[in-house]
């Protein structure tokens, strides 16, 4: 029986790529966010499977950015360990890391309020 590999899906824009000007097509125009390289390496060294989970397509420009900045990853927008019969539209992971997220804690009232007042971290600076 194979051992379960801890899997994390990490958003690209706003988490790995600074993305200071928002979407500008397929170009990756900014630098990596400070600490991204070290954080990804720490996850890799702790045994995590790292999936870059982004609305971007898996393009040569995206891979070139990751590789030229020595940003470790295993896959882009795919989990080869995805259970048979599951929807490939949402990649299975143990953790999702995104700059535009709300963590659901079982309280819908609190969650709706958090959604209505949400501001991405980049706009708080």
Segments (PLM) and residue ranges:
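HAD-like aspartate-dependent phosphatase fold
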Residues: 1-125
